[in-house]
């Protein structure tokens, strides 16, 4: 869930460039989403894109990251620190970062699983633990996100987005029509196949190729463009349940995140 606000030529643009929406399948998550709706943190974007299937697609009213900021209000969050070592001492954990040490009774790791594996390897003897075998097998899809600011309106139909429309693009959205940007800017998520093909190429050339492709596909005229690469955009396989409790370490270690529960925001929440 990633959003950003930028100013270009004295104009404000806000865009989502990670998860674009979420759905609800369980009562537990549905109850929570209803509460967010009452607080005007989220709203129904649409019931489908090219086809209306009747299932609500929810969006955050001010960008997806804004929802995270609201629900984490009051928590003490340490940012811009890399965990380099994890230790367990009888009844508590100690995490060492490039700046400080942190201690806690429980440890919950929600990073993409390849990063989770590297963290777990810093725990003495954990690399030989059977629990690592399953998560080591999970592979991820890559995604290159192209963000474009526009000097004029796009020609996108309501609700302003297209999903899985061809072999090059997984999702393309006009953030103004979506309702989060005061000026027109488009987010385009390249397909895994195209992202893999272009991943190691020169970034300027990649951007030019993607801009040309999207211009030909939608007949739009971007003024400025940016890229963001998602190395772990989506897991190719999901794990059952909503978390893993590791039997060792006195049941004080848990693995969670969107790889559980269907690779969706709902799975990460539950």
Residue map of PLM features:
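Catalytic phosphate/metal-binding cores of nucleic-acid and nucleotide-processing enzymes, i.e., regions
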Residues: 1-10, 24, 41, 83-86, ...
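N-terminal FAD cofactor-binding segment of flavoenzymes
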Residues: 2-46
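Central helical "cap/lid" subdomain
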Residues: 7, 11-12, 104-159, 220
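Short beta-strand to alpha-helix junction loop
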Residues: 21-27, 46-70, 200-209
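A conserved short coil-to-beta-strand element within the FAD-binding core of flavoproteins
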Residues: 79-94
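Active-site substrate-recognition segment that forms the wall
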Residues: 145-198, 209, 213, 217-218
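Flavin (FAD/FMN) cofactor-binding core of flavoprotein oxidoreductases
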Residues: 208-209, 213-251
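Short FAD-binding loop at a beta-strand-to-alpha-helix junction that anchors the flavin cofactor
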Residues: 242-270
């Amino acid at each position: 869930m990633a959003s950003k606000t930028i100013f270009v030529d004295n104009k404000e643009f806000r865009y989502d460039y990670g998860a674009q929406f979420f759905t609800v399948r369980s009562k537990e998550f549905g109850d929570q989403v209803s509460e967010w709706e009452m607080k005007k943190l989220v709203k129904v974007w649409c019931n489908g894109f090219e086809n209306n299937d009747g299932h609500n697609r929810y969006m955050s009213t001010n960008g997806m990251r804004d929802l995270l900021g609201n629900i984490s209000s009051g928590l003490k969050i340490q940012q811009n620190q890399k965990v380099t070592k994890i230790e367990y001492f009888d009844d508590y954990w100690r995490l060492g970062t490039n700046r400080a040490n942190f201690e806690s009774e429980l440890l919950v790791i929600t990073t993409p699983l390849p990063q989770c594996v590297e963290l777990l390897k810093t725990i003495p003897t954990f690399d030989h633990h059977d629990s690592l075998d399953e998560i080591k097998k999970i592979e991820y899809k890559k995604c290159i996100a192209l963000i474009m600011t526009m000097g004029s309106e796009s020609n996108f139909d309501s609700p302003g987005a297209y999903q899985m429309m061809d072999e090059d693009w997984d999702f393309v959205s006009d953030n103004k029509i979506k309702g989060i940007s005061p000026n027109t800017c488009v987010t385009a998520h390249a397909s895994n196949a195209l992202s893999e093909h272009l991943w190691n190429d020169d970034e300027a050339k990649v951007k030019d190729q993607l801009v040309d492709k999207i211009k030909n596909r939608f007949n739009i005229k971007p003024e400025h463009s940016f890229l963001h690469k998602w190395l772990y955009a989506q897991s190719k396989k999901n794990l059952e349940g909503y978390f893993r409790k590791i039997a060792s370490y006195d049941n004080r270690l848990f693995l969670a995140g969107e790889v559980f529960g269907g690779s969706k925001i709902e799975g990460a929440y539950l």
